[in-house]
Amino acid sequence: MTLFERPKPQMGTQDDVVLRRVGGFVIDFVVVAVFGGLLTGALSLSPEGGSGVLALLLLLLLLYFFVFEGTYGKTPGKHLLGLVVVTQRGEPCEYREAAIRSALRVIDGLPGALYIVGLITIYLTDDRQRLGDLAADTVVVRAAERGERL
């Protein structure tokens, strides 16, 4: 399965993907941080610029998740760890759901709180959903094996 296709979900696997979700987020965060660092350098923004650089990185992070999840149902981090975002009914995560998930990432990840709100919500909900998932009616599940697509 390639990054640029929507894999078929394995519904009912949301309980066993929590650590993969964390790993996928770490991968995605590193990708955005590296890209943001390069962009900051290219735009000659000073890291000491504080809030401007942080705002740019937050915007990049939100756009990254919105574009990848809305287009492919997964980010590169989720892809590498065999995960996909779908609706509770097993339908593809579209741009509407991706926008809701991305917007609520700000609360799930409260700056400086290391995603503690999202992690607590994931552990307290039956379908292992963070606030963005609950609002968008989505779940993160394992992707089907190679060759199976939505």
Task: Provide a role label for each language-model segment.
Residues M1-L150:
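Membrane-interfacial and juxtamembrane segments of integral membrane proteins
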